Structure formats: C-alpha cells, structure tokens
Amino acid sequence: KSLGSINPGANSAITDISCPSGYLVAGGGPKSGYSNFTMMWNAPLNTTTWRAEANNDGTGAINVDMQIVCLAVAGLHSQVITKTLGSINSHTNSSIIDIACPSGYLIAGGGPKSGYSNFTMMWNAPLNTTTWKAEAYNDGSSAINVDVQVVCLAVSGLHSQIITKSLGSVSSGSNSPITDASCPSGYLVAGSGPNSGYSNFTLMWNAPISTSTTRSEAWNDNSSGSIFVQMQIVCLKH
C-alpha cells in the first residue's frame, strides 16, 4: 500500500493496511527509492492490521510504499505488546529496551509508534525467538517520545529462526547495496529490522519481497563518516 506523495517537511497520511480475512499480521516495512524519511508509525495497530506514517525530512517530494506480511494457520493466536522508550532528549539515544513475548509465544515483528519525526531506530529487531530489542536516536532539536509495538504469535508446532545479514560499511551520503535475506527452506519470512550502533540512517527498504525473502537498503545521512548496519529477520515454520 502506498503512503502517496509526501511533501518536504510534511507527514504522510496515517495509513492502515489490513490482512485478508482469516490472516494475522506478522510484520511490515517501507519500500522506497528515496532517503531522508522517518517512519513515525511502522507497527501493528492490532492483530490483523499494520499502521504506517512517514515524515519527509528532505528537500523534495518523496514516495514510500509499505509491504506487510500476513500469516494464516489453523489455531494461530496473536498478541500485540507495547513498550515505551520513554522521553528521549535531543541528539541522545534512548535506553535499550527488550520486549518479551508472553510464555508460549514467538516474536514475529514490530516497530515504532510516535507522534514525532526525525528519529532513527538504531535497534528495531529480534534479539532472539521470543524477544524484540529497540533503541532510538533523537535527530531533532527537542525531546521526543517513541513507543514500540510488537506482534507475538503462538500455535502448536510453530518454530522460529533468526537470520542476520550485514549491509556492510555504508559511506557518508551513500546507499548500502540492496541486500536480500532469505529464510531457510520451509520457513516463511515475518518481521525484520536493524541492529546498529550508529545513528542517522534511513532504511529505504526494509520489507518482504516474497513469502520467504526480505529486502533491505540503508542510506547514511551521518556526515561524520561510515556506518555499519546489520539486519535481523524472523523466519517462521509450522
């Protein structure tokens, strides 16, 4: 689903993307040829819907599409867990927060929910098969608040693997290579996200391109030098 054309300094429309009847949402993310945008909302709204909103930090109009994963298995249950990163001062990192699924549930995907723009999700990825890790950096001039919402799934016989793939060294003002990460045979892709010690980057691509593969591309808008970004992907099998 498209967020449409977004003017400089403006927010997109808040866009809800619903799964087909009988399916539960498992993850999602942006697909764009543009850099310099912040995904203010990129998270589950409820068990069947993903919500997206982007802010254009750049000097020209941009377009951002959203792609989400929906899964269906007889007896599949879902819970959406919300945890706040708290108040984040200007040019400061939030605390690193771990969000654990309830007992018996596996992590599927997650992302930020905020009324603020100009922040980087340095960590927004699975830590292990039951926990999501989040850390945000505030690129703006005043304090902000960011919540993170994750999807947890449960059904008898559900298995998970976490796949890690590096985007390599990304030079200042440059894009990383477009990088595809595929799940092992028999597994389906769910959510994904970055694991980085660096701030000030945009994930132009962080979305599924098929039922088993996620595509990632980062743009480094940090003027002080190269950065490294790793992507971590949840793969599920029943």
Task: For the regions a language model picked out, list residue spans one by one.
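Extracellular attachment/recognition segments
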Residues: 1-238
